[in-house]
Amino acid sequence: HIDPWKGFDSKLNFSPDVKMEYLFSDSYIIYAHANGGRENRSLREIAALTPYWYLKGSEYLPTYVSLDAAAGFKASPADGLWLHLAGGYQIRENDLCVNLMSKSAYMFAGLDRAKTKAAYGSAEAKYEYKDIFSLSVGAAYYSWSADGEEENYLLALKPELELNLYAEGKVAGGLRVGAGYDYVKRCSKTYHDVSNLYAKASYALRDGLELFAKGRNLLGSEYCDANAYPVQGLNVLVGAAFRF
C-alpha cells in the first residue's frame, strides 16, 4: 500500500500487502499474511465508542497500521469440529490509546496517540452438532510496547490476556438458549479485569419474526470496557427482530 495523507501531519505511508495459503487433505490450511493500511475514524465515530472522551492535543491523526503480519493453521479433523491456531506481530502508528483522566471535577476517557507494537498468539476451537448444539472456546495473549515515557499510561486498557467461552443449543421448537463468559486481563493493574457472564434466549415465530432476551454482566462485576466506558450492574435487553 502507498497511502498519501494531507492534514496536520502530511506524509506518505507504506505497508505490505501479501497473502499466502496452502490447502492440504481438504481439511487443513496453513496461511501467512502481511498487510496494513490507514484506519480513519471521524469524531462522530469516536463519540459512538464512548460519550465521555477528551482528546489530548489539538489535532486528531488517523491510525496507520504499517505492519500486520500473522501466520496460522486451520483444521477440521472431524465433522463439525474446527480448530484455529495463530500468531502475529503488529506495528501501529498514531494508535488510539484510551485511559481515564480527570479534568475539572469529572472523569473522561482520555484519547492519546502513540506508536505501539504487539506480538500475539491465539487459539480457538469450535464444535457444532447439526443445528442443535454449538460450543466455542478461545484464548489470546498479547505482549504490548509503546514509544514514549508514558508507556504504562498508554497501554493501561490494552488486553494482555483474553479468554472466551460460549455454548448455544436448541431446546424445543423455535426456542434457543445460549450462555457465555468473557475474561480480559488488562496490561495495567489499575483497572479491574473484564469478567462478563452473559446469557440469551430467542424464540422463532412464523414469517421471520423472532423474540429475544439478553442479559450481560450477570455476576454484577464493575469494570471499564476497552474504551474506558464504565460497566456496572446487570444489563438486560428484550426485543423482537424481523427478517425479510
Task: Identify what each model region corresponds to.
Residues 3, 7-15, 19-244:
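Exposed, low-structure sequence patches enriched in small/polar residues
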